[in-house]
Amino acid sequence: MELLDKLAILSDAAKYDAACTSSGVRRGFRPGMIGNTTSSIAGCCHSFSADGRCITLLKVLLSNACVYDCKYCVNRRSNDTRRAAFTPRELAELTIGFYRRNYIEGLFLSSGVLRSPDYTMELMIRALRILREEYRFNGYIHAKAIPGAALELVRQLGLLADRLSVNIELPSQQGLQTLAPDKSREAILRPMGLIRDGTAQSKAELAKYRHAPVFAPAGQSTQLIVGATDDSDRHILHLTESLYRKFRLKRVFYSAYVPVVENSLLPSLDTKPPLLREHRLYQADWLLRFYGFQASELLDEAHPDFDTRLDPKCSWALAHLEQFPVEVMRADLETLLRVPGVGPVSARRIVSARRCGTLRFEDLKKLGVVVKRAQYFLLCDGRAAPGLRFSPATIVQQLEAVERGLLPSGEMQQLSLFDAVG
């Protein structure tokens, strides 16, 4: 099979993996090395780093052949699809060739399970070792560790990659047993623990020894599928909170299930991917990470799923109207962060700006506040927004109208690397 044919198959097979960001790790020029993690050039797969930069990665599988038969996966053993596999050298040469042509600045590498997890990981390590040691590639690499592989292989992979991730796949043990019986929760969580400990140890050693080996400097992430099982948003959010706390994950990625295979245990093929639900989970994830919320505050047994009509912070605020309106001139930073339309940056700007004088609603807009949302929950020097009229009965409809204006119209689709452009 020609190399271009392999690339077409294996890049298309990788499109369902959502955990693809560079995380903002900054490793600049090194003498004798090729590439860096900070440039921004056009390329194969656009992703965004933690500081908002658009970066480009070659996003491929080492192989889409797999000994597992996960019912939701397009690459499962029983699915009749074209199979391909790169050799470690082919993958390394392809990556360095794309980099030298200015197509990419890094690599995102995952794989189906060939023969066994250990065998697959050995091939991935060999490919990355050729890149790092033979071609002196210094660019960004995000590698997916294979659950069930020997921990020593995970350690070796972490010494070659900037970020590691282990996909948790499904939110519950029951879902995993039903749809992916070849996988186990223990096999997924064990390498997560090793990566957590490895990154902590690496940081401690680097503080003492400047040239100590660096282990996964950008940390670890994971991905879970939303909509393949009947797990509630509440269950997913509590799982996310636990993963952040126990394993110090940098990111949890949510992937709306795209029906690609027919199975009685899965949604039918004509079911649309729950993209808006995925979006709400990402918004709630940010509330956990940057706004001081806890999962138990956002959802409870009476309301186990998000109202997709409103963003999670608006939903929380409407359920706690007794805490509003908030006085801009007196509220502390933590209180401001709970106001819809106010983010971490704008909240800090408010705290700083109000020292210089009284703030008005027109000032809030200049500070980055989304006044269309925030005006229902704020007072400026004891006054509501000019001309604002609403009641608890109508505020939901007014916020829904704001939300409809912020969401993209039409159906969103995954783009292929080989789609025609023009």
Task: List PLM regions with ranges.
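Conserved AdoMet/S-adenosylmethionine-binding subsite of the radical SAM
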Residues: 92, 97, 115-298
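Flexible, acidic/Gly-rich N-terminal and inter-domain linker regions that tether
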Residues: 1-65, 370, 378, 386-409, ...
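Short, flexible active-site-proximal loops enriched in glycine and acidic residues
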Residues: 67-69, 85, 98-108
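Conserved, mostly hydrophobic/aromatic
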Residues: 57, 70, 109, 166, ...
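Canonical Radical SAM [4Fe-4S] cluster-binding loop centered on the CxxxCxxC motif
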Residues: 60-89
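Residue-level signature of tetratricopeptide-repeat
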Residues: 353-354
